[in-house]
């Protein structure tokens, strides 16, 4: 079966075969013996990009390690690489099936992009255009104390993000969040390594965002379960402008305060003071329709409700995923990113209770 990631259809075929024991079903391979599969999601906010490449055979998938990848932006060659690696992604069992080609290129909203993969089986080419970028949104926030069923309390940061639609066209979006931590250290020992305040850590981390209070992202208010794929909960926060076309909409999101303040992989000295600045970073991604449909279909795959496979019920025939690779198969997309940073404050925690994140004291003017 020479279709891009149609394991949905193959599963349905296996079910039919198991249910038809009296009549053997023979599947004859069709199409080319070997096809180049390209997958990539390029972001205008990144300078380092990755193209995943495989060879799809009739009975297996293997990494395409012998390609030369070229990236053209507005007709000009931006990058070329023949160095194939692997993505070290925990819990991803498909990493040994894909070669990863990394290159640096500058891509902006509205740019025309062409990705070429040249190898012994010919040249596979993907042509795409970076969508327009969404205007920079206004973000406000406040703290809220919530109570668990057992009566204990915890702190939540509520965000209100006023999104303005790109006018005069249909649009598809996604919002994601990260936390930025800047930790400064003041050494009071007799022989300090650094004089005065010294920047010890400056890092960003992915954080979960709660969309249960937003009717656009999660109309049913479904809570995301950590170990369960739930298409309806929209964990990755995709949305369209269908309900606010050419207008604006306020996204209501929330995050645990401790997720933004969690200080991992560092030690604390009793003779030092620490000052921590916390920021929330939101990326508003503008997608093509094909990228949106592909991403949502991947989320739908394997989603079950009360033991019923939703995909098997919805698709009565082959599920056709978007494909924009000439001379091969796959989907290469580019997303235009609008980034906004929200300062959540600077704190001076006591090292004796530094993990009591909900009660960190804010920095006073005398500490600066």
Residue ranges and their predicted role:
Residues 2-9:
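Bacterial N-terminal signal peptides that target proteins for export
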Residues 18-20:
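C-terminal motif of bacterial Sec signal peptides marking the signal peptidase cleavage site
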Residues 22-368:
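A sequence/structural signal for flexible, mid-protein segments enriched
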């Amino acid at each position: 079966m020479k279709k891009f990631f149609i394991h949905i259809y193959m599963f349905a075929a296996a079910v039919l075969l198991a249910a038809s024991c009296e009549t053997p079903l023979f599947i004859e391979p069709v199409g080319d013996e070997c096809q180049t599969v390209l997958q990539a999601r390029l972001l205008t906010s990144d300078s380092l990009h990755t193209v995943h490449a495989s060879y799809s055979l009739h009975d297996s998938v293997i990494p395409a390690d012998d390609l030369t990848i070229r990236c053209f932006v507005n007709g000009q060659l931006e990058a070329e690489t023949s160095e194939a690696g692997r993505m070290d992604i925990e819990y991803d069992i498909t990493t040994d099936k894909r070669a990863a080609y990394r290159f640096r290129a500058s891509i902006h909203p509205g740019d025309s992009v062409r990705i070429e993969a040249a190898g012994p089986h010919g040249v596979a080419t993907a042509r795409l255009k970076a969508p327009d970028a969404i205007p920079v949104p206004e973000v406000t926030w406040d703290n809220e104390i919530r109570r668990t069923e057992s009566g204990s309390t915890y702190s939540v940061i509520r965000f209100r993000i006023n999104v303005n639609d790109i006018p005069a066209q249909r649009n598809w979006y996604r919002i994601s969040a990260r936390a930025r931590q800047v930790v400064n250290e003041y050494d009071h020992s007799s022989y300090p390594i650094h004089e005065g305040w010294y920047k010890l850590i400056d890092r960003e981390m992915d954080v979960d965002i709660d969309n249960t209070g937003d009717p656009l992202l999660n109309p049913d208010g479904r809570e995301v379960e950590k170990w369960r794929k739930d298409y309806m909960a929209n964990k990755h926060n995709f949305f369209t402008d269908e309900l606010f076309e050419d207008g604006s909409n306020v996204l209501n999101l929330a995050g645990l305060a401790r997720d933004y303040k969690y200080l991992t992989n560092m030690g604390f000295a009793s003779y030092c003071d620490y000052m921590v600045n916390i920021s929330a970073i939101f990326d508003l991604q503008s997608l093509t329709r094909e990228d949106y449909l592909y991403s949502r279909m991947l989320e739908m795959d394997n989603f079950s409700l009360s033991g019923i496979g939703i995909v098997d019920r919805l698709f009565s025939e082959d599920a056709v995923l978007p494909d924009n690779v000439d001379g091969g198969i796959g989907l290469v997309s580019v997303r235009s990113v609008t980034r906004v940073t929200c300062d959540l404050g600077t704190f001076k925690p006591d090292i004796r209770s530094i993990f009591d994140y909900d009660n960190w004291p804010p920095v006073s003017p005398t500490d600066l």
